[in-house]
């Protein structure tokens, strides 16, 4: 039996509203990275956590602490979500930190099938992430009305 955890990109989940629905669908259907498990092997999803965010000097340490929340419940493999695979320039650093801190846990990069190329995905995410938006400052300065 494989006991899995998924780490999602906090920018994708918190700022862009990703609900991990594609990751979970492919987990259930054994597609994408989950297709690497034998059909006869039972898969259990122990939990999903978000990355602590784009790093400062403590980024890898913060991620290691978050992963402890899964290791305490017997996770044996951590999957970095497709968002991390396609978007994160720090994924290899994070992967190394987890492998060093948890040598008995396998770290895999990827979850669901790729629906577009990673480059196209990055461009599309950048477009929605960088849209101008209104903030509380606009309300305070009375700039929140259209026109």
Kindly give the residue locations of the regions a language model identified.
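Structural motif
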Residues: 3, 76-77
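Active-site charged/polar residues at nucleotide-handling catalytic sites that mediate phosphoryl
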Residues: 73
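Short Gly/Thr/Asp-enriched flexible loops that form oxyanion-binding sites at enzyme active sites
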Residues: 88-102
